[in-house]
């Protein structure tokens, strides 16, 4: 098996620890063994389509833009401005003023892909956050993004993997 330099503490191994808490603890642990970094990248284990090239590109973007962090994002497949809520068993537009607008006329909105975060360590230490003042987007294609939280998510990831990697792949 792989050798690991340390394990996360109980405080950062629970359902309530933030990613920033985990990154800070990992950076502290590396510093205790004499390893200090100017930049860091936290990769989520539930992001199956992350590639070395994507991380390299995001890290280059971090440096080129002198950003605090680079966060992969993907455009919502349908405009959230036209979402509905269920109240008393009936559908109600969240923003009624957008219901008659064409979807292509609404501002494109993006969300965090939950894949990885590239950080300037010094600025991260000062702000203790991933979402800092100068965050640069790393825009991803929807086919390269699939968060896995449910069995259905897993099935969708398998289908995307097969489409991306070719028909010779058995899933």
Report residues per predicted region.
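Hydrophobic helical membrane-anchoring modules
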Residues: 137-139, 144-171
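Short phosphate-binding loop-to-helix
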Residues: 1-39, 49-53, 57
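Secondary-structure boundary motif
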Residues: 28-32, 64, 126-130, 163-166
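Conserved beta-strand segments of alpha/beta enzyme cores
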Residues: 3-4, 134-136
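Conserved core of the sugar-phosphate nucleotidyltransferase
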Residues: 16-21, 48-134, 140
């Amino acid at each position: 098996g792989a050798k690991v330099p340390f394990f996360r503490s109980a405080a950062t191994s629970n359902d309530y620890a933030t990613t920033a808490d985990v990154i800070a603890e990992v950076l502290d642990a590396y510093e205790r063994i004499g390893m200090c970094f100017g930049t860091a990248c936290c990769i989520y284990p539930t992001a199956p389509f992350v590639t070395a090239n994507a991380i390299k590109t995001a890290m280059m973007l971090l440096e080129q833009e002198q950003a605090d962090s680079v966060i992969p994002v993907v455009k919502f497949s349908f405009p959230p401005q036209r979402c509905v809520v269920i109240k008393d068993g009936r559908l109600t537009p969240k923003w009624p003023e957008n219901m008659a607008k064409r979807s292509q006329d609404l501002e494109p909105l993006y969300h965090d892909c939950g894949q990885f975060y590239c950080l300037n360590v010094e600025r991260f230490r000062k702000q203790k956050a991933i979402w800092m003042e100068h965050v640069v987007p790393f825009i991803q294609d929807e086919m390269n993004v699939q968060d896995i939280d449910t069995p259905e998510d897993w099935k969708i990831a398998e289908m995307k993997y097969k489409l991306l990697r070719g028909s010779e792949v058995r899933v």
